[in-house]
Amino acid sequence: MKRCVTFFLLLLAFVMQPFAQGNTCPQLLECEMQSEILGCTKRYCIYLPQGYSDENRTFPVLYLLHGLTDTHTAWRDKGDVQDIATELINDGKAQEMIIVMPDAGTTYDGYFNCDGWRYEDFFFQEFIPHIESTYRIIPDKQHRAIAGLSMGGGGTTWYAINHSEMFSSAYAMSALMGLVNDSWITRDPDARRRVFMESAVANNNITAVENATQEQRAKIASVRWFIDVGDDDFLFDNNMEFIKAMRQKRIPYQLRVREGGHTWQYWQQALYIALPFVSESFGE
């Protein structure tokens, strides 16, 4: 009888082992915080690497921005970020890092400050301080990076240009680099969409680089830049205009034009380049 009990306990321990180990595996959590600036609750997803189970360790952080019509769950549900990050870390191609995916609204809100939506203020005055005081993050420029796709690529670029003291690197995928003011924007019957379009005009990354002073240029150049856009992307020309401005100002950058369009398949593959790239910045 004693042998049977011993065998049963050993078998139970063997069966339960994967569940016990699951607590130390990489996790992707969905959380929330209250914003006084926006006057609402904002949700976010956060990837915690395997090493986060060691309470004595701290980690670099990547803020990963979604695109238009999506939310904080897009990189989790469509971008396969957890599996790709874990694969790259396990293969030694990327550092262990915390990846934070904020919510910039579902449609036509975005990452800029505009009437009734001070998202840029929220991001830097509330969101980053909340994240970096809640989780074990190394809170300095060298260990902080930003990346994003489409609208989030534009937000990535704008934030890295105007808050260069915050980020060691910026990786813009299929980015909306800016819009030129046109009568069709002011005639748009959708007021919410019109506000978003007007904010994209006011926060034009191309113009920001073109008009940069020598002091501003030096700050922008303190960020390691990577522009990634597909040869079939409708924003290809928009990205080439940004590259032209960077070249004129002699700001170093890396450019990758790959086969593909404005698709999740493209952005999933971009992560295989983005995470090693920001990891190199963390190590500098």
In which residue ranges do the predicted regions lie?
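Positively charged n-region of N-terminal signal peptides that target proteins for export
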Residues: 1-4
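Bacterial N-terminal signal peptides
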Residues: 6-15
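Sec/Tat signal peptide C-region and signal peptidase I cleavage site
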Residues: 16-20
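Non-catalytic cap/lid and distal C-terminal segments of serine-dependent acyl enzymes
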Residues: 21-284
